[in-house]
């Protein structure tokens, strides 16, 4: 497969990931309000779960073809999840003096994202 085709697959996945991130974030604001960065937390945990599934699928050769790795892994999940937004959310919480919320956000993002990746991986491995 040519490098141009691979870049096209990554861009396609990225477009869907970015749109999904926006929609999930907006839905979280509607459902849960703006008092906590629920949107970032949600996309990071869901993205980690999908990555766990994806890694297990590649290992078991359920998704052995290379375009899927680029479309889902680099494109979709790369655009869906975000460390820079997570960092900025925490800076804003710090500036507001909301140190408990900031700490909670850090703990929840790290713990739930790693747990979700492990659960996703285990689901397809067993």
From Swiss-Prot:
Belongs to the fluoride channel Fluc/FEX (TC 1.A.43) family. It catalyses: fluoride(in) = fluoride(out). GO terms for molecular function: fluoride channel activity; metal ion binding. InterPro entries: FluC. Na(+) is not transported, but it plays an essential structural role and its presence is essential for fluoride channel function. The chain crosses the membrane at residues 4-24, 38-58, 71-91, 104-124. It is found in: Cell inner membrane. Na(+) binds at residues 78, 81. The keyword Metal-binding applies. Fluoride-specific ion channel. Important for reducing fluoride concentration in the cell, thus reducing its toxicity. The keyword DNA repair does not apply. The gene is fluC. One of its GO terms (biological process) is cellular detoxification of fluoride. It is a multi-pass membrane protein. This is Fluoride-specific ion channel FluC. Keywords: Cell inner membrane, Cell membrane, Ion channel, Ion transport, Membrane, Metal-binding, Sodium, Transmembrane, Transmembrane helix, Transport. The lineage of its organism: Bacteria, Pseudomonadati, Pseudomonadota, Gammaproteobacteria, Vibrionales. GO terms for cellular component: plasma membrane.
């Amino acid at each position: 497969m040519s490098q141009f085709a691979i870049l096209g697959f990554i861009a396609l996945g990225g477009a869907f990931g970015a749109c999904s991130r926006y929609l999930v974030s907006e839905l979280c604001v509607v459902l849960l309000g703006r008092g906590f960065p629920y949107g970032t937390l949600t996309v990071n945990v869901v993205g980690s779960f999908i990555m766990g599934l994806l890694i297990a699928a590649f290992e078991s050769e359920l998704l052995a073809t290379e375009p899927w790795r680029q479309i889902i892994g680099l494109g979709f999940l790369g655009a869906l999840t975000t460390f820079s937004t997570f960092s900025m959310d925490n800076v804003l919480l710090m500036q507001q003096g909301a140190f408990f919320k900031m700490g909670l956000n850090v703990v929840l993002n790290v713990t739930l994202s790693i747990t979700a990746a492990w659960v996703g991986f285990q689901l397809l491995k067993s």
